[in-house]
């Protein structure tokens, strides 16, 4: 009999079988889906940004490398900071 490394509902976390509990396996599945997904490159704009290793992302089209989050190129905190910086820059340009 052939063993499957994944299942329909749990995806790649099916490799753990019945171990570790359902919630943990679902969480692992969600993280792995996020990290394996192709993201939009901030330099060239193509959907070719892939994870090389922890927090290192590379565009397969233009070759640009960047540091980002461990599982996604931009973290939630990074988005908040970028938005705050954008607001400060916009307010300074309005004053001038």
Curated annotation (Swiss-Prot):
HAMAP family: Ribosomal_eL43. The keyword Kinase does not apply. A zinc finger (C4-type) spans 41-62. Keywords: Metal-binding, Ribonucleoprotein, Ribosomal protein, RNA-binding, Zinc, Zinc-finger. This is Large ribosomal subunit protein eL43. Its cofactor is Zn(2+). One of its GO terms (molecular function) is structural constituent of ribosome. Signal peptide: none annotated. It holds the Pfam family Ribosomal_L37ae. It comes from Methanococcus aeolicus (strain ATCC BAA-1280 / DSM 17508 / OCM 812 / Nankai-3). Binds 1 zinc ion per subunit. GO terms for biological process: translation. Belongs to the eukaryotic ribosomal protein eL43 family. SUPFAM superfamilies: Zn-binding ribosomal proteins. GO terms for cellular component: ribonucleoprotein complex; ribosome.
């Amino acid at each position: 009999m052939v063993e499957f490394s994944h299942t329909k509902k749990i995806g790649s976390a099916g490799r753990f079988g019945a171990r570790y509990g359902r919630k943990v396996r679902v969480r692992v599945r969600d993280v792995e889906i996020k990290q394996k997904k192709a993201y939009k490159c901030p330099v060239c704009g193509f959907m070719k940004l892939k994870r090389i290793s922890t927090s290192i992302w590379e565009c397969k089209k233009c070759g640009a490398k960047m540091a980002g989050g461990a599982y996604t190129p931009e973290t939630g905190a990074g988005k908040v900071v970028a938005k705050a910086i954008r607001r400060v820059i916009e307010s300074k340009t309005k004053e001038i």
